[in-house]
C-alpha cells in the first residue's frame, strides 16, 4: 500500500518512544521507506539500533555525524519525504518547531521538509494544558501541521488526564490517510451502508443474516483513503470502524432506512453494501416468548426497500450502486434488480462460490451496468473495494 513512499518519523524524549518501534515495523510491512530521526533525549528511552534494525536505514541523531554519505543529510532526507510524523512530540520540540529553532538533526530536517507534517504531543497533563504549549500547537496548525490530540488516561508520572500518545495503529491511520492513495475522490461525498440488520422477535431473539460488514467497511475505508468525505451507515458488526469516516450505527432496517434517506440527497455516490432484512416480525413481543410443545409460527411483514426508494428519488448526476448476493442465476437476477431499482451499477456475487460471500476476507464480484458486465477474479475485499471505486470513477467521469 505504501510502496514507493518515504516516511520520516521524528522521535523525541518521552516514555512513549518505544511505541514508535511498532509503528516503524507496521510501515515497513506496508513497504514504506522509513527513516527515523531522534533527539538525544529520545535515545535514553530507546536505542537507535532498534530503529535501524526495523527500517534498514541509519537512524539519525547527530547533526555533525562524520559518517555521512557526501550529502547534506538533513536536506537530502527532507527532499525525499512524502510525510513527516513527530511522535511522541515533547513540549520542548513543539516549542522549537513553532518558533523556527533548528538546533539538532530532528528540528533541522523537519523545518527543511515541504511535505505534510503530523505531530503527536505526549507529555504530562499539566504540561499539555499549559497555555504556552497550547499556543505553540496553534502556531504549528497555522503553518499547516496536523496535530493529533492526545488520548486521556493513566500517565507514566502517575497522573490521570490528557497527554497520552495514541496507539501505533492510530498513528498509522493518519499516515495512510495522507499518502496511501491518489486522492482521485477528493471533493466527493460518498454514502456506504454495511453489515446486517436485526429484527427483534422479543427482548431475547431476533432475525438477522450472516453479513460481517467486511465488504462495506472495506469500501468505506478505500473511499476515505482516496480523499472522499465518507458516511458509513452500519449494522452491528465485530469490525473496528475506519478512522476519518462518519459512522452512523443502526440496528433495524427501519433505522437504516431513516439514516440513509436523511443524508442521501447530499451524496454524490451511494454504495449500498448492507444486507438488510426483507422481512420483520409483524408484532414484537414485549416479553420473552416461552417455548411450547409443537411448532411456532411468526407472522412477518415487509420492511421498507431502501434501494428502491433511492432509485426512485435519485438526484441528477448521483451514482447509485447496489449489491446482490445470489445462489443461482446471479447475472440475470442481478440485472433484473439493476433495472427494477434504477441503479447505475450492481456488484453481484454468488454465495456458493469459493472465496465469495459473507464472513470471509476475499470476494469474487461481477460489476454489472446497463451496458456491460465486468467479472473480477478472487481478491481481497480491500482490493475488490478499490476495483469497485475505480469502475464508479470511470463511469462518473464518462457522465461528465
Residue ranges of model-derived segments:
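A cross-family phosphate/adenosyl-ligand binding-site feature
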Residues: 1-118, 124-213, 217-400
Amino acid at each position: 500500500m505504501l510502496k514507493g513512499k518515504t516516511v520520516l518519523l521524528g522521535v523525541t524524549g518521552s516514555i512513549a518512544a518505544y511505541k514508535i518501534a511498532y509503528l516503524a515495523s507496521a510501515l515497513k510491512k506496508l513497504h514504506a521507506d522509513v527513516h527515523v530521526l531522534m533527539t538525544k533525549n529520545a535515545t535514553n528511552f530507546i536505542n537507535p539500533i532498534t530503529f535501524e534494525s526495523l527500517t534498514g536505514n541509519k537512524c539519525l541523531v547527530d547533526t555533525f555525524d562524520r559518517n555521512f554519505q557526501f550529502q547534506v543529510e538533513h536536506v537530502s532526507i527532507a527532499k525525499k519525504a512524502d510525510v513527516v510524523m513527530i511522535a511522541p512530540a515533547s513540549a520542548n520540540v513543539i516549542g522549537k518547531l513553532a518558533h523556527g529553532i533548528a538546533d539538532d538533526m530532528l528540528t533541522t530536517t523537519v523545518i527543511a521538509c515541504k511535505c505534510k507534517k503530523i505531530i503527536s504531543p505526549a507529555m504530562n497533563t499539566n504540561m499539555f494544558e499549559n497555555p504556552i504549549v497550547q499556543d505553540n500547537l496553534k502556531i504549528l496548525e497555522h503553518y499547516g501541521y496536523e496535530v493529533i490530540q492526545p488520548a486521556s488516561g493513566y500517565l507514566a508520572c502517575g497522573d490521570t488526564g490528557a497527554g497520552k500518545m495514541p496507539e501505533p495503529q492510530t498513528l498509522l491511520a493518519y499516515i495512510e490517510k495522507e499518502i496511501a492513495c491518489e486522492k482521485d475522490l477528493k471533493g466527493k461525498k460518498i454514502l456506504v451502508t454495511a453489515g446486517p440488520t436485526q429484527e427483534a422477535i422479543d427482548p431475547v431473539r431476533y432475525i438477522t443474516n450472516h453479513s460481517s460488514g467486511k465488504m462495506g467497511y472495506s469500501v468505506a475505508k478505500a473511499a476515505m483513503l482516496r480523499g472522499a468525505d465518507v458516511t458509513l451507515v452500519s449494522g452491528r458488526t465485530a469490525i473496528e470502524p475506519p478512522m476519518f469516516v462518519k459512522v452512523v450505527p443502526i440496528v433495524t432496517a427501519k433505522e437504516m432506512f431513516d439514516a440513509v434517506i436523511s443524508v442521501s440527497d447530499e451524496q454524490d455516490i451511494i454504495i449500498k453494501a448492507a444486507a438488510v432484512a426483507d422481512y420483520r416480525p409483524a408484532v414484537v413481543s414485549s416479553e420473552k416468548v416461552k417455548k411450547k410443545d409443537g411448532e411456532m409460527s411468526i407472522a412477518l411483514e415487509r420492511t421498507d426497500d431502501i434501494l428502491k426508494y433511492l432509485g426512485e428519488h435519485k438526484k441528477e448526476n448521483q451514482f447509485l450502486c447496489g449489491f446482490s448476493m445470489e445462489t443461482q442465476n446471479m447475472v440475470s437476477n442481478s440485472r433484473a434488480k439493476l433495472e427494477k431499482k434504477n441503479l447505475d451499477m450492481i456488484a453481484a456475487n454468488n454465495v456458493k462460490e469459493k472465496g465469495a460471500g459473507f464472513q470471509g476476507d476475499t470476494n469474487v464480484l461481477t460489476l454489472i451496468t446497463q451496458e456491460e458486465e465486468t467479472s473480477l477474479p478472487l481478491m481481497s475485499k480491500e482490493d475488490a473495494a478499490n476495483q469497485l471505486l475505480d469502475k464508479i470513477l470511470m463511469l462518473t467521469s464518462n457522465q461528465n
